[in-house]
Amino acid sequence: MSMQDPIADMLTRIRNGQAANKVAVTMPSSKLKVAIANVLKEEGYIEDFKIEGDTKPVLELELKYFQGKAVVESIQRISRPGLRIYKRKDELPKVMAGLGIAVISTSKGVMTDRAARQAGLGGEIICYVA
């Protein structure tokens, strides 16, 4: 059986990995997952990520902890295959009053809500991270 929502699977692996105090989590790689991982790394929610393998690439995320607690408090899928959520630049949400981020897929690539607002872009809201 094929996976219906690979992005939700990625977010669940991060959530479960941090709940179990894992150092790293692995998952099948894709361009969108790598772009999301890059945003999470830039924002300081994960330590690092790397891609291994040629025929079937595997994405490995190194999870981040601060004083023994997971840095990612909550990670939530918003737009999903059955119900896509798109917002214009003036409708972009602020997660936890600006303390968290919304990961958004725009025409210029995957970025945070802050970067999309500065660039004057809207797009599909992939997930919220706090």
Curated annotation (Swiss-Prot):
Query: Would you say which domain of life the source belongs to?
Result: Bacteria
Q: Which Gene3D superfamilies match?
A: 3.30.1370.30, 3.30.1490.10
GO cellular component term, pick one? ribosome
Q: Which GO terms describe its biological process?
A: translation
Has UniProt tagged this entry with the keyword Iron? no
GO molecular function, a single term? rRNA binding
Q: Which UniProt keywords apply?
A: Ribonucleoprotein, Ribosomal protein, RNA-binding, rRNA-binding
Q: Which Pfam families match?
A: Ribosomal_S8 (PF00410)
Q: Which family does it belong to?
A: Belongs to the universal ribosomal protein uS8 family.
Function text: One of the primary rRNA binding proteins, it binds directly to 16S rRNA central domain where it helps coordinate assembly of the platform of the 30S subunit.
Oligomeric form and interacting partners: Part of the 30S ribosomal subunit. Contacts proteins S5 and S12.
This one is known as Small ribosomal subunit protein uS8
Name the species this protein comes from: Pectobacterium atrosepticum (strain SCRI 1043 / ATCC BAA-672)
From the UniProt record, report the name of the gene that encodes this protein: rpsH
